[in-house]
Amino acid sequence: MPAARDPIGVLDSGLGGLSVLKALREELPNEQFLYCADCAHTPWGDKPESFIVERTRAIVHFLLRKQAKAVVLACNTATAAAADILRKELSIPIIGIEPAVKPAAAQTRTGVIGVIATRRTTESARYLSLLRRFAGNVKVVTVAAPGLMECVERGDFNSETTRKLLLKYLTPIKDAGAD
C-alpha cells in the first residue's frame, strides 16, 4: 500500500512533459515527484504501438520500484497506446493526458478547432473516441506533425526549420478558419 509521502511518477518520451511536471508541482506543492524521460528512444510518435506500450510499461515499473504511488503519463502518445492497458495491469492510479478537444470545442467561436499531435496519437482509437465524445458539431482539423517534437526536444524553437514545420502544420488549421 502506497504511503502518503511516496512520490508521484511522471513520464514522457522526452522533455516535453516537464511542463506537465511544473503544473503538477504548482497544483500539488506538498507532493514529491519523480520524472523519467525516455530521451534514448524519443520521439515515440512514429514508433509501433507495441514499442510504445513496452517502453511505457518498463518506465512505469521503474517508477514503481522507486515507490511511486501514482503515475502521470505526460505524453499523449503514451496515453493513447498504453493507459488502458496499464490501468488493467496495475493497482495504482495511471493518469493520462490527451489533446484538449473538450475545452477547445466548448470555447470555439468559429466552430473550427485544430489539433497538432504525433501520428501515433492522431491515428489512435483513443483520440478518435475523444473526438466522438467531445467535438460535437465542431469541425476538428487534425494534423500529424512529424519532425516538430524533435525540434522541441532540441530546444530549437526559432530556427528556420522549426518555422517551416510550424507553417506547414498550422496552415491547414488556419485555412479552415480555426480560432
Task: Provide a role label for each language-model segment.
Residues M1-D179:
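Non-catalytic structural scaffold of enzyme domains
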